[in-house]
Amino acid sequence: MAITRFAPSPTGYLHIGGLRTSLYSYLWARKTGGEFRLRIEDTDLARNSEEAMKAIIDAFDWVGLNYDGEVFYQSKRTDIYKQYIDKLLESGNAYKCYMSKEELDALRAAQEAAKQTPRYDGTWRPEPGKELPPVPAGVEPVIRIKAPTTGTIEFDDGVKGHMKFDANQVDDYVIARSNGMPTYNFVVAIDDALMGMTDVIRGDDHLSNTPKQIVVYNALGFKVPKFYHVPMINNPEGKKLSKRDGAMDVMDYKRLGYLPEALLNFLVRLGWSNGDQEIFSMKEMLELFDPSNINKSASSYNGEKLLWLNSEYIKAVSNERLIEELKFFDLDLSNYPKKNEILDLAKQRAQTLVELKKSITDIIDIPTSYEESGVKKFIKEDTKELLEKYLLLLESNKNSLDSVEKIEEFTKPFINDNGLKFPQLFQPIRIALTGGTQAPSVYDIIFILGYDEIFKRINEALKRNFQNT
C-alpha cells in the first residue's frame, strides 16, 4: 500500500511537468489501495500567490485527480517544525551558527578563488575539544544540521537505480533561518515522515535534495521512503520545455479546448509506456502503471500527438458530455433541435473543443460575411439561377429532408441533369449557408438546418450578391 503525495509551491502556475508527477503519484497510490495526498509548500511567504494556490486546486479538480484527506499547508505547521528543530539541537544533531552574511560571502569568495566547491567551513560546528568563537551580541543565529563528514549517503531509486553521494558533498546546510523560518529540505523531510509517505515520486531536478533530506531522516530516526526521480520533459529539440513548447498553466489547456482525459493520457505516456499502446482509459492506467517502469531518459513533448489524442477523445465521449464542455466556451446546445446530429458531424473534424465550437457555429450561426476568395472562385453569372432552381427542388422535396441519404438521392440527378460538377453547386451553397468553403458535407448541413433556414440564408446571400457590406 503506497502513500504518495504531490507538493507544489504556490509561487506560480501548475505546469504539465508537475501534473505528470502528480498523475504518477496518484496512479501508484490508487493501484496499491493507498493514499494520495496534496501538500502546499507555502513557506516562502514573500513569493506566495493566492491566485496560484487557487489555480493548483482548480487544476486538480479539472483533471479529476482526487486527493485524500485535507490539503496540508506548510505555513500552518511551523510549530511542528520548531519542535523538531529543538529536538535536533537537544540531541546535538543541529547547532546554532552566528556567521554573518559578510563572513559567509568572504568564505565563498576565498573558496572560489582557490577553485574549491563553496561550502560551509564548520566554524560554529561543535566538536569534542573544539573551542567555538564567542557569541556576537545582537546576532540572531541560523540553525544548521550536522551532516556526516565521511562515508556515503546511499539509496535505491526506483527509476535511476542505486544512488551514492559522498557525505561531505551535503554540507551542514541551514535548516532554520535567523527569523526562525525553516528551510525547504528540512520541512519536506519532516512532512514526508509525519504524513507517512512510503513512496516519493518527483522530478529528477530534486535528486540533489535527496541526500540532504536523508540526513534529516537519519538524525530523527525516521524511515526513509522509496524515491522515484522522474526525468524531465524536454522540447522536440531536447532542450528545456518553454511556455511556447507547452510548459504553460495546466488550466490553459482547458482554455485551449483540451479534454482532461486526453491531457492525462498524453502525460502518462511522457516517460512510461505499455508496448505500442497509445490510448489509455483511467482504468487501464491504474491496471498497468508501475513507477519502476518509468523511462530513465528524458521524454519529448509532442504537441501533434496531444492534438491527435484530443481529437480521439472528442469523438469517443458522449454528446451529453460535449454539450456540458462547450458551455465553458459560451456555446449552449441544450435546446438545439438537432444537437446530436450536429455534434456527430462536427466532432469528426475537431481536434479541440475550440475547433468543435467553430465547426458548430459555422453551421448554426447565420453568416455575417462571405469568404472573398471562395466568392471569387465559385460565384459565377449563372449561380443565382442555379441556386433558385435548387431551392425549388428542396421545396418540392420537403418531406425528404429528414435524412442525408434522401437529400443525396434527389440532389445527384439535379447535378447530372444540369451538367454540373459537384463544386459548382455545393461551394456556392456552402458559402451561402456558412460563409465559407471549408464546411462539412452540404447534405449534412441541409439536413441539420432544414428548409426554412436554408431558404432564408440562400436568399440573403443572393440579395447581397455574396458581397460583404
Curated annotation (Swiss-Prot):
Annotated catalysed reactions: tRNA(Glu) + L-glutamate + ATP = L-glutamyl-tRNA(Glu) + AMP + diphosphate
Intracellular or extracellular location(s): Cytoplasm
Short motif ('KMSKS' region): ranges: 240-244
Primary location recorded for the protein, binned into one broad class: cytoplasm
Region (Disordered): 117-137
Residues noted as binding ATP in the record, renumbered to the chain: 243
Keywords of this entry: Aminoacyl-tRNA synthetase, ATP-binding, Cytoplasm, Ligase, Nucleotide-binding, Protein biosynthesis
A single Gene Ontology CC term: cytosol
Motif annotated as 'HIGH' region, chain positions: 8-18
Similarity remark: Belongs to the class-I aminoacyl-tRNA synthetase family. Glutamate--tRNA ligase type 1 subfamily.
Function: Catalyzes the attachment of glutamate to tRNA(Glu) in a two-step reaction: glutamate is first activated by ATP to form Glu-AMP and then transferred to the acceptor end of tRNA(Glu).
SUBUNIT field: Monomer.
Protein name: Glutamate--tRNA ligase 1
Species this protein is from: Aliarcobacter butzleri (strain RM4018)
Gene behind this protein: gltX1
